[in-house]
Regions:
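Terminal alpha-helical anchor/extension segments at protein ends
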Residues: 1-366
Length: 366
């Protein structure tokens, strides 16, 4: 079983088009007696998948073979006791992938010619990369992070702290109280300039946000030494020396959410500017055709909503269907995947936040 770790790996799944693909989403419990419900829920959803496969006229032997990896997983008690908030499974005749989510999923089983990926896009599209620089005069640590995980980067060629010959307690006190400040600040600035030069080896050509973690009086000095253009003005304030990687990551999340919110607000602003110019639409049929031709720059789709239908790629016609129709797919999912594959941006919002309050909206490139 392969684990989906990134948006690129998700898009690899999007290329799968092998006749029958099973996509399964479910909430999971992390601890306690409730973890037993994970297996029960999974068993019920696999039964749902069996029924949908029967509607597609698969032979019983084909259904058993396709679902056999899921049946084996069903009986793995250790696996189900080691979950996060949500679980997703993707099965086809030649692939078996899973994803443990930090966010919960609604129960959903989709059997179609493509994998149903919109619930996962909601998480992956917001899983931006960022760096945390934990700074003190005694130690420097650098972490590369996403919303879901973090790892410390071993630093070479970077001073780990000011000279041991200095009385750092006295040095920090003078910095904090601004006594003897010019000479003291000059020493700290020189130290941070060395740190900045060393970081260039790790951050060169990167465009990801850098979050400073350290006491407030050090940040203005570090900012003066810094040459990395994506250093945030907001910081994790306080001495980071006693904080673990997980603790620093947790403190960074409100700052990361603010970055994501700004990007989402910019996208909504772009939609408002484009409305009425022919470069924006809330019409499902128009958007599906635009997604097929790679015209969408920004797409908004509603979380937890499906629009079932069939899009004929040869003639561009769209036929809406019932959810249980074996030939149908979620057209919102189709639009999201096509937009990502063509280099556009997808925002999966709560339905009330999609422009116009509908299930879908888009800004066109042309």
């Amino acid at each position: 079983m392969n684990t989906v770790q990134s948006l690129d790996e998700l898009l690899d799944l999007a290329h799968k088009h092998v006749g029958v693909c099973v996509s399964l989403y479910m909430p999971t419990y992390r601890k306690g007696a409730e973890t037993q419900q994970n297996q029960i829920r999974f068993k019920n959803l696999i039964r749902d998948a069996e029924n949908q496969l029967m509607q597609r006229d698969l032979r019983p032997s084909e259904t058993r073979e396709l679902l056999s990896p899921a049946q084996e997983l069903m009986n793995n008690e250790l696996f189900w006791r080691n979950q996060k908030q949500g679980f997703a499974l993707f099965l086809s005749p030649d692939s078996f992938h899973s994803f443990k989510s930090p966010d919960s999923f609604d129960e959903l089983v989709v059997v179609a010619e493509r994998f149903h990926l919109k619930p996962l896009i909601r998480i992956m599209a917001r899983d931006i990369v960022f760096f945390i620089l934990a700074v003190s005069l005694r130690n420097i640590r650098l972490f590369e992070c996403t919303r879901r995980q973090q790892k410390e980067i071993p630093l070479e060629g970077i001073p780990r702290g000011l000279s041991e010959a200095l009385d750092l307690d006295d040095f920090e006190k003078r910095l904090q109280l601004h006594t003897g400040s010019e000479d003291t600040k000059a020493q700290a600035l020189k130290f941070f300039q060395q740190v900045d030069r060393g970081l260039q080896e790790y951050l060169r050509d990167r465009r990801d946000a850098l979050i400073f973690a350290g006491v407030e009086y050090l940040f203005p000095i570090y900012r003066e030494a810094n040459t990395y253009p994506r250093l945030l003005e907001t910081t994790i304030s306080g001495n980071p020396e006693g904080l673990s990687a997980d603790e620093l990551h947790g403190l960074a999340m409100p700052l990361v959410e603010a970055i994501l919110q700004e990007k989402e607000n910019d996208a909504l602003s772009q939609y408002r500017k484009s409305a009425g110019t022919g470069l924006a639409s809330r019409d499902l049929r128009e958007i599906i055709q635009a997604a097929h031709h790679g015209r969408i720059g920004i797409l908004f789709v509603a979380h937890g909503v499906q629009e079932w239908g069939v899009f004929d790629e040869d003639n561009g016609r769209i036929h809406m269907t019932e959810p249980n129709d074996p030939i149908s797919e979620d057209l919102l999912d189709f639009a999201a995947i096509r937009t990502l594959l063509n280099g556009g941006t997808v925002h999966v919002f709560d339905p009330s936040s999609v422009p116009g309050g509908g299930p879908i909206a888009a800004v066109f490139r042309y």
